[in-house]
């Protein structure tokens, strides 16, 4: 009480004490945020618009997420709860009230949606889980997942404003991941290990180049600017 009461009284003298809950309104189109999942999209360094976010975590997720949903050996309840959490977090990126709650009942400033790492972590965890469980008998779910990944890309091109370079490289990477995952699913032993290394190399190349491009677009690569 000796610590909490002075802290409470002190907070009541700040500007935050006079704020009220924002309305449950949307910042804009959800497709503008889905766009940030794509390769070579410009990351946010500092932005006054509260609806921006950084959620890029690899093109492979476009395929593995659907493979995860179609895989029968992953429990239905696990799929449902993980998808619900993903949807709630993603909706929170675009909703003023939910965003306010995620930021500890506080308005965000400068770097919006700082809790996006939770979305990235869960998405990658789901993708990793299904990748580790793939077996030869899962080839149908893998092929359907790949088809869904391409369908998602086609839909995104109609809803999002994607640059030609982003679209081209996304198609290339999805195709590369599709080939690797089919091979990974159908093979065993040494060949499966080799394909897993190829898959790892493709992922590293993609994310490394995207990271370099991201730093370059924000002006942190040129030493003369320090």
Provide a role label for each language-model segment.
Residues 83-100, 106-226:
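Contiguous transmembrane helix-bundle modules in multi-pass membrane proteins
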Residues 1-81, 88-89, 95-105, 112-117, ...:
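Periplasmic/ER-lumenal interhelical loops and adjacent helix-loop junctions
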């Amino acid at each position: 009480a000796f610590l909490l009461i002075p802290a409470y009284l002190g907070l009541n003298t700040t500007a935050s004490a006079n704020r009220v809950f924002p309305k449950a309104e949307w910042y804009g189109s959800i497709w503008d945020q889905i766009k940030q999942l794509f390769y070579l999209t410009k990351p946010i360094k500092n932005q006054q618009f509260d609806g921006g976010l950084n959620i890029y975590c690899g093109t492979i997720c476009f395929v593995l997420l659907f493979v995860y949903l179609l895989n029968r050996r992953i429990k239905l309840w696990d799929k449902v709860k993980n998808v619900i959490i993903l949807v709630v977090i993603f909706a929170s990126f675009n909703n003023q009230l939910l965003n306010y709650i995620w930021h500890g009942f506080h308005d965000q400033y400068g770097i919006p949606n700082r809790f996006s790492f939770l979305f990235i972590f869960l998405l990658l965890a789901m993708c990793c889980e299904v990748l580790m469980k793939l077996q030869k008998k899962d080839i149908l779910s893998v092929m359907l997942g790949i088809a869904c990944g391409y369908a998602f890309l086609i839909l995104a091109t109609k809803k999002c404003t994607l640059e030609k370079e982003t679209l081209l490289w996304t198609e290339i990477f999805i195709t590369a991941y599709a080939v690797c995952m089919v091979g990974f699913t159908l093979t065993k032993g040494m060949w499966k290990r080799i394909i897993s290394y190829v898959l790892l190399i493709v992922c590293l190349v993609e994310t490394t180049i995207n990271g370099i491009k991201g730093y370059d677009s924000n002006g942190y690569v040129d030493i003369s600017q320090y």
